[in-house]
Amino acid sequence: MPMPYGSRLAATMTRRLGRECVYTPSARLALYLALRRWCRPGARVLMSPVNDDVILFVVLAAGLRPVQAPVSVWDGNIDPAAVPESTWRNVDAVLTTNLYGVPDRVLELRRRCEQLGIPLFEDAAHAIGSHVDGRPIGTFGKAAAFSLSKHVAGMAGGFLAVEDARTRRELELLRDDLLTPGRLREDLATTLRPLARSAVRSLHLVRPVWRTMERLGLLERDAFRMDLHAPRLTASAREAPSLTAYERWVRVDLHGYRSRHGSLVRGQLKLRMARLDEDLARRRAGVTLLAGTPWASPALRDRTAHDGPLPLFRVPLLVHDRDALVQRLVRHDVVCGYIYDPPLDDYAGAEFVEPSPDPAPARWFAAHTLPADPLLARRIVGAFTKERVADAHPSLLRPVPDVTPPRLLGQ
């Protein structure tokens, strides 16, 4: 009998995590598998509005209703204590974010889910290597989605971690039904793209390459959020659950998110996974440096001082005039991504999501956070110093205006 697709990579992750793992071409496909396996169509999923818009569309593609939770103003993750009891009584699942690798309040969320008898799903795409109470993120819920395009910069690959082998085998079959045939040309591009990025950075060509891509219209996004295309999104809802119906949104930034990559891509991912611990160590060093700056939140400084640095995917730095700073940093060969502004309820509107009952913390955090790559910590500190970047603090928070657009973005 042939081995399941990607089983060697999955076995590597199983040894690291202590849970059965299913290999997937991306974390977004892994999350979709979990949502389809445990949630009936129409189920309501509690999630943070400070999140990748792709995740919103994965939830919609699964035929579910995203319910936006109040978040902590310090880290953008769900604040369980701020979720109204009426909301808790009317949700069918909870999806964590572990934003930038900072762990969710997963012990409280797990306790709530157990009381309610609903599944807890962990989006651990940013959080390989993060721990809570001595346990790795990805081992607290019913299932957890991991990404290899973050920490090891693989441009492909992910895992769905589950509790037992029987469930793993069931999900492998569901995954196989959703995979599309791979192509050698796409596999070559997936393999070479991270090498090209590394070369651009090492040759100090980030600024000219980025500006050229902007001028030529080669960037898939013109803003922090993709165009919503609301009328098409409304029409797609009639076909949910369906990845095909939501393809134009779910594939953004990763067109091969469900391609059956061949041995070339999987071989490269195996090499990159072998260097994961080295990557995590470098990230901890960068987090230590950035946590000691004025732009780090007190919560991050305290966590680093008492528990040691986390191997964050990005370090959320709190700054004034963030959008202008993003443009200025390109002059210092620093391109900032993973900015999730505006929050999903302001972005999508009440037709597609249930808005948060307290949107102010999410709006403040989303507007003031600059996600800093800890692998570039020294360069970023130098750039911030030269640019005289002012730190922001939520204690200065004034009433945040309702920034919901008069019509849905993308219409």
Spans of model-derived segments:
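PLP-dependent aminotransferase-like
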Residues: 11, 29, 36-115, 119-131
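Conserved glycine-rich beta-strand-loop-beta hairpin in the small C-terminal domain of fold type I
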Residues: 28, 232-276, 280, 284-291, ...
